Structure formats: C-alpha cells, structure tokens
Amino acid sequence: MAWTLLHSKLHQNLQRRFPELQGTRILVAVSGGQDSLCLLHLLNDLTKQWQWHLAVAHCDHRWPTDAGIADHVQGLAQGYKLPYFQRDAQDLPQTEAAARHWRYHALTAIAKAENFPVVMTGHTQSDRAETLLFNLVRGSGSDGLQAMNWVRNLEESGSDKSPIRLIRPLLEISRQETGDFCQQQQLSVWEDVLNEKLTYRRNRIRGELIPYLKKHFNPQVEKSLAQTVELLTAEVAYLEQVSGEIYQTLSQTDQKSLNCRLLSQKPLALQRRIIRQFLQSCQSQSPNFEEIEQIVGLINAPNRSQTSSLPGQGIVRVEGDFLRYIYQGK
C-alpha cells in the first residue's frame, strides 16, 4: 500500500472524531463514482490498523442511465474480497429527494439485517459547500444551513441496541482530491451521466455557480463554505440545548400552553427556537418562518389576540400570561 496525503487525512480525522470505531463492522455505501470509490479504497487500506470488518452496499435506482452500475460495483467488492449487498428500487424514484430518501431507507435496511452499526458514505467537502448554497438560495434558517453533519442516526436498531449511525468521514476532503486520488491509484470510476445534467439544481450549483465563485471571488470557496458549516453546526447545537431547557420551564404540563410573560424576557433568537419547539409538540407539520413570526408577534400582544389558521388546523391565542394552542379541526 502506498501511503498518501488522503490516507493521513482520513486516519487522523477518524482518530480525532471517531476513535471508538476500532474493530467496528462498517457498511460502505458505494455508488461507483469517484467519491465513494475513493472512500472504499482508503478504508480498505486502513483496515489492518483499525481492525474493521468492511462490506459494500449498493442501491440500484433502476433508472435507465444506471444500467451496468450494480454489476460494476459488485465487481469492485469482489476485487477487494469484501461482502456485497444490494437493494433494488421497487418503484423508480422520480426526484432527487425521493431517490435520496429511498437510498437511506435501503442502507438502513441492509445495516439492520446484516448487523452493521455504522454506515459510511463518500460525501465530501464539496458536497457540503454545495448543500449549504442550495439551502441558502431556497431559503433556510441556521438549522438548514448546517448542511451535512459528520454523523447522524439513521434509525433505532432496537430498544436494546444503539442506533445505526451514518458517518461521512470525507467532509474535509474535496471532490478534486478524490478525483486525483482515483487517477493516481488507477481506480475504475463509473461516470454518472446524470451529474452532467444541468436541469438538476444541485448540478447547476456544482457545474456553474461553484466554478464562478472560484474564478471571481475565492479559489478556496468550497473550503470556506465548509468551515462556515462547521461553525454553524456548533452554534446551532448550543442554541438548541439552551432553548430546549428554557422551553421545558415555560411550557405547561399539557404541552399546549407557553408562558409568554417569561418568554418576552428572552432574546429573539431563543424566542423563535422555543416557539418552533412549542409548535412541533402541538402539530405534526414543522412550522415555517412566517408561522413562527406570527407567534413572536403575539408575545406582547393584548389578551385574546390570535394567529390566523396554522397548517395543523390550529391557532395560537393569547390567554392571560400564556400562548395557548387551540386545535380547530373536526
């Protein structure tokens, strides 16, 4: 094995963030593209040091452009002498979001069935920057701007077990670096033709906006945006913890009332988060910015003031010192 800069980056990053992964069973999601193939090759090279038990998972959307990819990935797994698991979509996903949702569901199913506590994907620093821009231009709060955390829980694997974790270990490595690595290692990359179609918004960000920003504003824009995400993630986590603790002191036992007199003494940033948590406990739909602002406007409003109807068929009304959620459905 030729030790490279990417081997060092990944090894050191895992030591710093995920030292508990020593000896773990890891399911590696492989699409056949350069990022996931780079991840697979690096993990395979580091297996002796980390004592991992690796396996390859591939999710076949069964799109016409995907013909042959599953066989290619299975061949890669055989070349590495690793177990291979595949899931085929029963209904062809019609959108990027639907395909992404199905992939995570399929990966979770494989991990549960085959007893893998960790799933790894090849998302890179470039993906993180693109997701931040995508969320920013469509409108998003600081929570949405976190854009790809290092780790998240996929699904509870059972009451007596820990959750299956999705880990993205390449978030400090750019797509340029994974491409160069695959060329240097002479890895057989499957080029996804859909990545070139500019009808997809994410592809336009990747193929047009990012290159423009690199050329005219900052050659290191991907790294800068990814660092912004890292800062936002830490700040959002802190604000969520603080607002959650305050929410528990302001809400009544029925979870339908909030003390607006005490809420008025909190900073606006915390008021918005507390109100969002309040609405999430009262209705199934997540509130949007306008709905939260309606309720912010009630904090110091006269008694009996109320919002217009909310998506969950409810309203929020001022009743004395409290904001009360009232369901109006049948």
UniProtKB/Swiss-Prot annotation:
A Gene Ontology BP annotation from the UniProt entry: tRNA modification
Superkingdom of this entry's organism? Bacteria
Q: Which residues form a coiled coil?
A: none
Q: Keywords in UniProt for this one? A: ATP-binding, Cytoplasm, Ligase, Nucleotide-binding, tRNA processing
- Gene3D superfamilies per record: 1.20.59.20, HUPs
User: Which InterPro entries does its entry note?
Assistant: Rossmann-like_a/b/a_fold, TilS/TtcA_N, tRNA_Ile_lys_synt, tRNA_Ile_lys_synt_N, tRNA_Ile_lys_synt_subst-bd
GO MF terms on file? ATP binding; tRNA(Ile)-lysidine synthase activity
Q: Which residues bind ATP?
A: S31, G32, G33, Q34, D35, S36
Annotated catalysed reactions: cytidine(34) in tRNA(Ile2) + L-lysine + ATP = lysidine(34) in tRNA(Ile2) + AMP + diphosphate + H(+)
| Gene Ontology cellular-component annotations | cytoplasm
Where does this one sit in the cell?
Cytoplasm
Q: What is its EC number?
A: 6.3.4.19
Q: Which PANTHER family match?
A: TRNA(ILE)-LYSIDINE SYNTHASE-RELATED
Sum up the protein's function in the record's words.
Answer: Ligates lysine onto the cytidine present at position 34 of the AUA codon-specific tRNA(Ile) that contains the anticodon CAU, in an ATP-dependent manner. Cytidine is converted to lysidine, thus changing the amino acid specificity of the tRNA from methionine to isoleucine.
According to the UniProt entry, the note on domains is: The N-terminal region contains the highly conserved SGGXDS motif, predicted to be a P-loop motif involved in ATP binding.
Protein family = Belongs to the tRNA(Ile)-lysidine synthase family.
What is the name attached to this protein's record? tRNA(Ile)-lysidine synthase
